[in-house]
């Protein structure tokens, strides 16, 4: 689910996507590193018995955005029958897939992005990032895929009306 993370006074600390991987297993993908520290502070204050850690160094992300993003992923993503396929994946949902076949490199694919277009994000272990990039690049050639830098991403995010901490909101925004 996409949501705001708010202080007790209602002002926004961050925005992001919260994934539920299991009964007691969640992943917060936000824009500000401090949000993880804030979650730890809240858990400590409330005496929650939880484990909160940063996974930034353990997960890489490649965004595949645009009208052909689904077709690109369908060329190399294998999904078990018990998981939603790329075609069936709804906004802010994810699946656990593999590259090419059932014993391929494990990946998580979410129907998320920062462009306002049809799009997906592929989450993988850092050791697999080059393989994932190469698969996306090869599958995207027939669609004239183009890498997108942060400046261009910022422009499409603004055009789509998507907010970013420090620009469209801060800890004084409620």
Where are the regions that the model predicts?
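Acidic, proline/glycine-enriched N-terminal capping motif
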Residues: 1-6, 11, 151
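Short beta-strand and beta-hairpin "edge-sheet" elements
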Residues: 13-16
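Conserved, structured C-terminal
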Residues: 19-174
